[in-house]
From Swiss-Prot:
Molecular function per GO: metal ion binding; pseudouridine synthase activity; RNA binding; snRNA pseudouridine synthase activity; tRNA pseudouridine synthase activity
Organism placement in taxonomy: Eukaryota, Fungi, Dikarya, Ascomycota, Saccharomycotina
InterPro entries: PsdUridine_synth_cat_dom_sf, PsdUridine_synth_TruA, PsdUridine_synth_TruA_a/b_dom, PsdUridine_synth_TruA_C, PUS1/PUS2-like, TruA/RsuA/RluB/E/F_N
Organism: Yarrowia lipolytica (strain CLIB 122 / E 150) (Yeast)
Name the UniProt record assigns to this protein: tRNA pseudouridine synthase 1
Superkingdom to which the source organism belongs: Eukaryota
Assigned keywords, A-Z: Isomerase, Metal-binding, mRNA processing, Nucleus, tRNA processing, Zinc
ATP-binding among keywords: no
Chain spans, region Disordered: 1-80, 505-528
Presence of the UniProt keyword Transcription in the record: no
Length: 528
């Protein structure tokens, strides 16, 4: 693009004006401005005359026409204007069936449904119904496709004269999307910018922390590296082998066919079926028997106190301010925005849901980048499964070397709530208002979480075995040295992305991508 001209313009920029100014003998004064003799109003008068002529011509041409400013939606001339107040709107939702939080026509999104409900309930006037920006519409945290939120916040200017406005809004929403309440704020409130921190929850079955299955690529690498399964993992896999043998499936047959189902699965597209040696006449009945036995043992697994303590130990290493460039996409080590502060990370005691044991991990941080939470969870689980040294490995991920950390399934992730500690102190102190929080609706939120979020997560895992497919993919991956950082030496040059990409290029091989940023879109907050 060429540079714009720097010639100053006074009045109309037509060439006639320039010639007239030249005739008047105007010259540039200090600062490059044009000097016009005081008292000479001829140029100004001509300019005003021309402006009047244009205005009269436009009025003449516009007779009988609606000359109001055009918008995407109709202007409602007879709509009674009602006062709008700046508010924080507390919401919760199950993200199943939605293409994320953020408005993204023509896709079905949380914001799209909520905004339409606001309009139908009269919380937003018809004249402002065509564009959320007219109401200063903003979200505290954007969640991606399929991700849930027990609590999220929207700030906007809204009509709240009706004391039943929340009930009216909810009457226009599906059951999986709720408005908990509305709180008055000051005019300058912006829910994203004034959010002090955010709390996320990640649910996962405890069998996710088991050692890799014997005979898999990862298991063989660990054995060669001198890392044996822990006692709990050893006993678990021995019991699976004994159960299979009692049903006529030998250990060798199990090893031969163990990876076939995962290789065919959608979660493991990176591994070609030809990479596993198996007979062309694979016994489908035997495969089904193996899957059924493994599934039953996963459901019956109960995590030990020792393994649970290790999970909690690793989570604590994340606390504080660190460079999380390895836990997102496309973020350079030197990028200041890669520095993030984690306030606390905790793991619940295990609990049973429909016979399967689960744990809940809570992550409280100031802000998060794209995929960050899912990659953090993945690193915790992989470290436990492979008996890695977390005190060595996790700090290495905060350093310059770039590695591929696979992201754990989106299934278990939900936004619990944004936190407004600093803003609430100011709001209560200066304005005497209650503040922005979810305390008034705790019972409703808990009931909603169990019915519309937790139960859907549990049911999807039981039916589709999402976590099993993810960790099986890691166990059978043969593409390159991507996961060799889980061995005793930790992160070495050979398992960095720069080294592997350079080597693949030199050998004329296709560079394998472990993940694509296909279902999530980078955004202004980069949440989750």
């Amino acid at each position: 693009m060429s540079e714009p001209t720097t010639t100053p313009v006074v009045g109309n920029s037509a060439s006639g004006d320039s010639a007239e100014q030249h005739d008047l003998g105007q010259k540039r004064g200090k600062g490059g401005n044009w000097n016009r003799p005081r008292g000479d109003h001829q140029a100004k008068k001509q300019k005003m005359d021309r402006r009047g002529d244009r205005q009269r011509e436009q009025e003449k041409q516009g007779e009988g026409r609606d000359t109001r400013r055009k918008t995407d939606g109709p202007l409602v001339a007879d709509e009674v204007r009602q006062p709008k107040r700046k508010v924080a709107c507390m919401i919760g939702y199950c993200g199943t069936g939605y293409h994320g939080m953020q408005l993204n026509p023509p896709q079905k999104t949380i914001e799209g449904d909520i905004f339409q409900a606001f309009v139908k309930a009269g919380a937003i006037s018809q004249n402002n119904a065509d564009d959320p920006k007219k109401s200063a519409f903003m979200r505290a945290a954007r969640t991606d496709k399929g991700v849930h939120a027990a609590g999220n916040v929207i700030s906007l200017k809204m009509i709240i004269e009706d004391e039943n406005i929340v009930e009216k809004i909810n009457s226009h929403l599906p059951e999986q999307l709720r408005v908990w309440g509305v709180s008055r704020t000051n005019k300058a409130f912006e829910c994203r910018k004034l959010c002090s921190s955010r709390v996320y929850e990640y649910l996962m079955p405890t069998y996710s922390f088991l050692n890799p299955r014997p005979g898999t690529v990862m298991s063989e690498k660990l054995l060669k590296d001198g890392t044996s399964p822990d006692e709990e993992g050893k006993k678990y896999w021995e019991s699976v082998a004994a159960d299979l043998e009692s049903q006529g499936v030998s250990y060798d047959e199990w090893m031969k066919r163990a990876c076939i189902d995962e290789i065919k699965g959608e979660e493991t597209k990176e591994v070609a079926e030809s990479e596993v040696k198996t007979d062309s006449k694979t016994d489908a009945a035997t495969l089904e028997k193996i899957k059924a036995v493994e599934r039953r043992h996963r459901e019956e697994f109960r995590i030990s106190g020792e393994r649970l303590a290790k999970i909690r130990e690793i989570l604590k290493i994340y606390e504080g301010t660190h460079n999380f460039h390895n836990f997102t996409l496309g973020k350079a080590f030197k990028d200041p925005s890669a520095m993030r502060t984690m306030k606390s990370l905790t793991c619940s005691d295990p609990f049973l849901i429909d016979g399967t044991e689960w744990v809940s991990i809570k992550i409280h941080g100031q802000s998060f980048m794209l995929h960050q939470i899912r990659k953090m969870i993945s690193m915790v689980a992989l470290s436990v499964r492979c008996n890695a040294d977390p005190q060595k490995l996790i700090p290495q991920t905060f350093e310059k070397a770039r590695i591929n950390i696979p992201k754990a399934p989106a299934l278990g992730l939900l936004l619990e709530r944004p936190v407004y500690d600093s803003y609430n102190k100011k709001l209560q102190g200066e304005f005497g208002r209650e503040g922005v929080h979810f305390d008034n609706w705790n019972d409703q939120i808990e009931a909603f979480k169990h019915k519309f979020i937790y139960d859907k997560i549990y049911a999807e895992e039981k039916g589709q075995h999402v976590f099993h497919a993810f960790f099986s993919f890691v166990d059978v991956f043969t593409g390159d040295a991507s996961f060799d950082f889980l061995l005793k030496q930790g992160i070495t040059k050979e398992c960095t992305t720069d080294y592997m990409n350079k080597k693949a290029k030199e050998e004329g091989k296709e560079i394998k991508k472990l993940e694509e940023d296909d279902d999530e879109v980078a955004n202004e907050q980069n949440e989750g």
